[in-house]
Amino acid sequence: MLTIVNEDGSCMREIRVEGDRSLLTTGKYDNDDQRVARIEDGWELYWGYKGDNSRFHIPMSAEKFDSISREVGPSRAVKDTVYVYARKEYASVEDMCAGSPMFFADDQTGVDGSLEKEFRWFYTDYVFTEKFSSVADYFSVPVTDYMSEEEASYWFAGTPDLYAGKPIWRYYELLEDFKEKADRWVFANLHYKLLSGIADRYDMVVEPPVSKDEFVAQLRDVVKQLASYDPSKLEYATVRSVISSHFGSDAYSPFINEDVLSDEEDEELDNYFGYLFLFYYDESIVMPGRVIDAGGGIYKDGVVTFTVDAGRFLLKDYEIRVVSRVVNVWAFVVTAALASALFVAVVYRKRIAAYFKGRH
């Protein structure tokens, strides 16, 4: 993703999306596809060759697509050679962020943005911020049930650095510990998702030992027991045994087997954590003037680049912040003019004073 911020507050956003024959030759983007980005009305589509900054309007002719396909040969796809770009202009950063094309779990990512101008006479500072709302509520079992907040932040976002000054062997040992905790959290949520399906069919449970609300309230305790097992070896029979023991009843056993889920529910379960691990992109930001604070991003050749992934706003909001400075040339001109005028006035005043003094 490329974001260009202008001095007047307007901005442009460009994202790169995967293109196939249909998109390239018709210009119609399939928003029903499981992709991070969704293109609504108002976006202009372009295509360009990989490694080339040239842009060409979409749609391209079918003949052009076939020509490119022949050029790349049978062993490669056109999408490996041709990129598709979607571009949109905005009047303000606020409008741009409110219209974010990025989606997490079928919901538009919550993004608040702003551009503040701080006037300093000889220069003006531009402060760009973009804040992503936390997705913690998406997961029924919080990660802090299995890891400390610091551990989770380091594992999913890379900060804070918990290994400063530690030897490599210790680093490896701690990472293994974190991985085990993170895996247990993942499987705890999957188990919760699976078992909460029983609540959706609670009217079909024969002689339930507790009410539906009480069943849901105890699910986190149940999945914590299940999380103590090796996820790769946990079988449905074990899950049934744990639940029967916890509730003192076999009433839920018929709902815990491989055939109980519909195809849609099975696909939803498969995608449940896919959203967390597949939501990933780099955002490059071009600011007016010279960047004086990259805010943790990587600054190179006038561009600040941040990696945006769901892990960074798993626990709390994630903010991007870049500060740039524009020199107000006119301020130097005005200051120089005022200084010259003042100098002339002082000299002229002295000459007038000397003239009248000489006449006395």
Name each region found by the language model.
Residues 27-29, 40, 308-310, 330-333, ...:
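Glycine-rich loops and low-complexity Gly/Arg-rich segments
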Residues 44-339:
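Mature, soluble, non-transmembrane domains
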Residues 20-22, 273, 350-356:
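Extracellular/lumenal and peripheral-membrane lipid-interaction modules
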Residues 340-360:
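Juxtamembrane interface at the cytosolic side of transmembrane helices
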Residues 13, 19, 88, 293, ...:
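Functionally constrained cores in energy, signaling, and assembly domains
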Residues 1-64:
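Start-of-domain marker
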